């Protein structure tokens, strides 16, 4: 079993008999000599959807739970449920909107490279690709000749996500966004 320092986002861990899917990890180092790093795992209980937070010292053993990854593509929305289809056998996986609210900011009909994370055959969450292409819906007018400056402006993308983009980017442009950092990477070709 891995130590707390080896746990990554997307791992499923056992917390008091409950399966918790790790969505975010925060590492803190207490002051003073000999202070061990403390890992704070944030996620949600797979069975109930309740948000959970747990802390472990770096060298503590954490019980992980096996997960399965299946390549999926977005299919359609039904109320507050988002339906994704397996790329191989066309099995449908249904996700509640609250469980994948952060991931929805990066998903449109064209998003490729997504994976459904399954725990005991049940869809728990989505794993996004490292970057996605999205269209800018609204931003300030572009400034010609601004490619040399490093100044940025806010831009609202087609999914509702707002990122900082260079001044030369205009409404309607397609841009590449890093899903982990939620940052503009470059203009899509």
UniProtKB/Swiss-Prot annotation:
- InterPro entries found in the cross-reference section: Elong-fact-P_C, NA-bd_OB-fold, Rib_uL2_dom2, Transl_elong_fac_P/YeiP, Transl_elong_KOW-like, Transl_elong_p-like_YeiP, Transl_elong_P/YeiP_cen, Transl_elong_P/YeiP_CS
**Per the record, GO CC terms?**
cytoplasm
Similarity-based family: Belongs to the elongation factor P family.
Q: Which SMART domains match?
A: EFP (SM01185), Elong-fact-P_C (SM00841)
Q: Which organism is it from?
A: Vibrio atlanticus (strain LGP32) (Vibrio splendidus (strain Mel32))
Q: Which domain of life is it from?
A: Bacteria
What Gene Ontology terms for biological process does this UniProt record contain? peptide biosynthetic process
> What is the protein's given name?
Elongation factor P-like protein
Q: Which GO terms describe its molecular function?
A: translation elongation factor activity
């Amino acid at each position: 079993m891995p130590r707390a320092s080896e746990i990554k986002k997307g791992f499923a861990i056992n917390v008091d008999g409950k399966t918790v899917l790790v969505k975010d990890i925060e590492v803190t180092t207490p002051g003073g000599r000999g202070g061990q790093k403390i890992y704070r795992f944030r996620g949600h209980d797979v069975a109930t959807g309740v948000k959970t937070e747990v802390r472990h010292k770096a060298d503590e053993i954490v019980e992980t739970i096996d997960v399965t990854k299946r390549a999926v593509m977005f299919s359609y929305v039904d109320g507050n449920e988002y339906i994704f289809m397996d790329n191989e056998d066309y099995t449908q996986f249904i996700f509640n909107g609250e469980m994948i609210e952060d991931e929805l900011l990066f998903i449109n009909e064209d998003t490729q490279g997504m994976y459904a994370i399954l725990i005991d055959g049940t869809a728990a969450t989505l794993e996004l690709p490292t970057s996605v292409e999205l269209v800018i819906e609204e931003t300030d007018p572009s400034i010609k000749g601004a490619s040399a400056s490093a100044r940025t402006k806010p831009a609202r993308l087609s999914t509702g996500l707002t990122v900082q983009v260079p001044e030369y980017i205009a409404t309607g442009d397609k841009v590449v966004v890093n899903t982990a950092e939620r940052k503009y990477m470059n203009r899509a070709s």
